[in-house]
């Protein structure tokens, strides 16, 4: 099935459980994307991407730790320990050839996407019940 809906790898387990007719466990972070495959929903407005590289490359002094938020219009990536990042307008530049990070015209967009990224990171936590005893 071809769809333009955005989904994340954290949605896989929720989708498998949904297909099997099982309820997701308490605290699962993903959401089933089966309705998006049927065209019944758009699923997510944005996705969060974490990339932790195994070693330094591409001119970086250390292994890349990258956090990205992507929606239909923008891709915004920050690199740990670096004073630069990446900002691409995916509607005007779908091949991501023009990095807008240092362009002052887009400073408001950088601020907005930074806030979205911080909010997403802030709400990442395991909400499953804690164990009653030590293992």
What are the roles of these predicted feature ranges?
Residues 1, 22, 102:
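Generic anion/oxyanion-binding catalytic loop in active/binding sites
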Residues 1-9:
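A short, structured beta-strand-centered segment in the mid-to-C-terminal lobe
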Residues 10-13, 18-86, 90, 95, ...:
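C-terminal cap/loop subdomain of S1 sulfatases and analogous C-terminal strand-loop tails that border
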Residues 95, 100-105:
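Active-site-proximal N-terminal segment of extracellular/periplasmic enzymes that hydrolyze or transfer
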């Amino acid at each position: 099935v071809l769809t333009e809906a955005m989904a994340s790898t954290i949605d896989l387990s929720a989708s498998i459980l949904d297909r099997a007719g099982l309820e997701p466990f308490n605290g699962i972070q993903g959401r089933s994307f089966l309705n998006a495959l049927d065209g019944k929903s758009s699923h997510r407005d944005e996705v969060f991407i974490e990339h932790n590289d195994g070693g330094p490359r591409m001119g970086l002094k250390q292994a890349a730790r990258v956090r990205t938020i992507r929606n239909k219009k923008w891709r915004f990536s920050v690199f740990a320990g670096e004073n630069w990042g990446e900002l691409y307008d995916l509607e005007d530049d779908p091949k991501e050839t023009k990095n807008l990070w240092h362009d002052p015209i887009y400073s408001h967009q950088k601020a907005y996407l930074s806030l979205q990224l911080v909010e997403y990171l802030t709400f990442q936590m395991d909400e499953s019940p804690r164990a009653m005893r030590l293992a």
